[in-house]
Amino acid sequence: ARECPGKQEWPELVGEYGYKAAAIIERENPNVRSIVKHERSGFTKDFRCDRVWVVVDSTGVVVRTPRVT
């Protein structure tokens, strides 16, 4: 398993607005940068302890559990 510091996932943010969720994530784990992306966007496959994808639909609402990826 990969060991990264701080909170790793935020299931409670599904249904929240993406940019609000991103701010909450960065406040709860200052080691990460949260990046809001549309669910149909391309995503890199590399793993990074300092990145969280915040995946939103066309209305800007989080549709997948944000987690360190």
Curated annotation (Swiss-Prot):
Keywords associated with the record: Disulfide bond, Protease inhibitor, Serine protease inhibitor
Record flagged with keyword Protein biosynthesis: no
Domain of life where this protein originates: Eukaryota
One Pfam entry name: potato_inhibit
UniProt record, GO biological process: response to wounding
SUPFAM superfamilies attached to this UniProt entry: CI-2 family of serine protease inhibitors (SSF54654)
Keyword Disulfide bond found: yes
Residues the record marks as site: Reactive bond: K45, D46
Single annotated GO MF: serine-type endopeptidase inhibitor activity
Function summary: Inhibitor of trypsin, chymotrypsin, subtilisin, etc.
Family: Belongs to the protease inhibitor I13 (potato type I serine protease inhibitor) family.
Protein name, entry field: Trypsin/subtilisin inhibitor
